């Protein structure tokens, strides 16, 4: 009898967890899931860009969007070694090791990457 009660409680708990999971995950529309994914990718892109600028705490972002294949693209402005903002420049962040700032590569190379990944 004791085993049956334990088994019954376990089954009830399993059903409750399954319902809760379905309510939280299944209740979202495709658009909501897409927005959440875009926010997560944008945040990750900001993190990787901040690792590349001289003063990460000063980084300001604008015109951000998710490009082709899920690459976060946008513009960043940050302070240089003298404490002055350098002006907004475009960035592409495919991964930590594949984050490009416009100032770090030849203009023609950056433009080609921007066309392929961001437009």
Each language-model region and where it sits:
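Sec-dependent bacterial lipoprotein signal peptides
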Residues: 1-24
């Amino acid at each position: 009898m004791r085993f049956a009660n334990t088994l019954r409680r376990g089954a009830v708990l399993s059903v409750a967890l399954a319902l809760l999971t379905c309510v939280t995950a299944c209740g979202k529309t495709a658009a909501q899931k897409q927005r959440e994914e875009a926010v997560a990718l944008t945040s990750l892109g900001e993190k990787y860009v901040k690792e590349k600028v001289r003063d990460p705490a000063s980084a300001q972002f604008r015109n951000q969007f998710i490009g082709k294949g899920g690459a976060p693209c946008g513009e960043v402005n940050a302070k240089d070694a003298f404490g002055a903002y350098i002006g907004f420049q475009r960035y592409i962040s495919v991964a930590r090791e594949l984050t490009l700032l416009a100032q770090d590569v030849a203009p023609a190379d950056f433009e080609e990457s921007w066309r392929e990944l961001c437009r």
